Amino acid sequence: MQESRQQKSGGGFELLFDEDRLKIYYNKIFPFSLMFKWISYNKLNAGQKALTSLDEGISSNYFHFREFSFTLANDVYCRYLCFKTAEQFKETLVDRVPYKIDIGAVYNIPPDRHNASDKRAFIPVQKEMVFDIDMNDYDDVRTCCTGANVCEKCWEFLKIAMIVLTDILVEDFDFENVLWVFSGRRGIHAWICDESAREMNNEMRSAVVSYCNLGVGNENSGRTTLSYPLHPRLQSIYKKLLPEFKRIIIDEHNLLSVEKHRKKFLDYCPDLTTKNKVDAIW
């Protein structure tokens, strides 16, 4: 049986998967009851009680009408999967052993019947709003790792991202249910689970994303010069992050001491006097 992880030459570990271990994980560890409770949002069928064990056969059309997709071994991709109960969900995962599970929208009919109806009649009715933050987005400012590699120092950036985005979503948009989860490889996902978010159309979602996006990207994307005075939300973020800047950027990553990182970092600075002063000091 293949080892589940191996140590890399540069430190840290690279995760390796094998079907035997995944089958044990799905059979013994995977939180099926919690997943069912979360994704059904207590929208159970008439006469049903809250789920307490998998063998109760508790059903929910809200769960049943939700699309799942699996990525199996050798990158075999399966769409339009759905399940009536948590027990059926478990049986399928243990049997098919997916390497990746994607949770899709809730449709107006069970997704496995999408070919039995007019495509215009198969429509999504609800879906959580999800923000995806990848670790490689921080390659300009982290000195420890690159790409999909992640260490404890890297996670400091993701922790800050969670704090900032949660503040915006809760304080500016009045969302209450923000679930942060590890994406499974190189980043984190924020699932906004409020019903108001699940009912948003694409235009509404784009407006929220646009509000949260400064447009200050990595070296391969466009950069935005901020105008002053700063927007009140940016002022609040600045005050909150200033102490973390010294701890993470200066002390932990020692970013300004390495010329190539310092140059890349100073490219973000709009004030020439400040850039020259920092460059001279370091």
Show where each model-derived region lies.
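Signature for HUH/AEP ssDNA processing cores
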Residues: 2-183, 195-202, 207-209, 214-282
